[in-house]
């Protein structure tokens, strides 16, 4: 498959004739391009192993697509939706997600890499993201409520005011993450590590902990 630029050059015609022109965008590539208002679900079901570097996506929809192992490093997503999208082992390193309509909740993203990305205030509620990497991310006021984040790595992330209520955080790593004002009410924190993490104002009501849960020595919760 060639570049998605070739496929999307005349998006209106492509969507209008989607039954005849339904395409497989696996292994497609784009570099430094802008995509606006595209509902990729009307074009394809597959974007596995695709590679989009330094791209801008505005008001695009990726609902239910198979995007496993795809790379979107150094890209920007404005008001984009990933409802039920399969993002296992995908990479969004150093990328930005913003806008009131941006949505990653209910996405399936095992071991997805968001290292150095900006996900501030993004809705990731009910996402399935065990083993995913949020290392040094901006997660200010991000919504992770009800998500499966077992074994996820939040090292050095700025997660002030983030919502982890009811989340599965067993074995998660919060080393040096800024968690001031974060809400862990009802979260499963068995085996989670909070070493050297600021926790001022964080809420842990009804959170589940065990002997393997590691909290900074100054916090007696």
Question: What would you call each of these model-derived segments?
Answer:
Residues 3-221:
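Tandem repeat scaffolds
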């Amino acid at each position: 498959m060639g570049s998605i630029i070739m496929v999307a050059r005349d998006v209106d015609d492509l969507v209008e004739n989607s039954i005849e022109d339904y395409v497989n965008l696996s292994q497609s590539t784009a570099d430094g391009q802008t995509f606006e208002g595209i509902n990729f679900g009307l074009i394809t079901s597959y974007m596995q192993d695709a590679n989009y570097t330094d791209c801008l996506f505005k008001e695009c929809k990726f609902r239910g697509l198979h995007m496993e192992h795809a790379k979107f490093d150094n890209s920007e997503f404005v008001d984009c939706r990933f409802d039920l999208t399969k993002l296992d082992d995908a990479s969004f390193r150093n990328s930005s997600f913003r806008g009131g309509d941006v949505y990653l909740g209910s996405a399936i993203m095992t071991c997805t890499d968001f290292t150095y990305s900006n996900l501030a205030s993004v809705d990731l509620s009910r996402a399935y993201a065990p083993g995913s990497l949020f290392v040094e991310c901006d997660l200010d006021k991000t919504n992770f409520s009800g998500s499966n984040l077992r074994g996820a790595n939040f090292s050095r992330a700025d997660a002030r005011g983030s919502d982890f209520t009811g989340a599965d955080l067993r074995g998660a790593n919060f080393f040096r993450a800024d968690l001031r004002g974060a809400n862990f009410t009802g979260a499963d924190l068995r085996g989670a590590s909070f070493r050297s993490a600021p926790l001022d104002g964080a809420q842990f009501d009804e959170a589940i902990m065990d002997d393997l849960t590691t909290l900074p020595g100054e916090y007696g919760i």
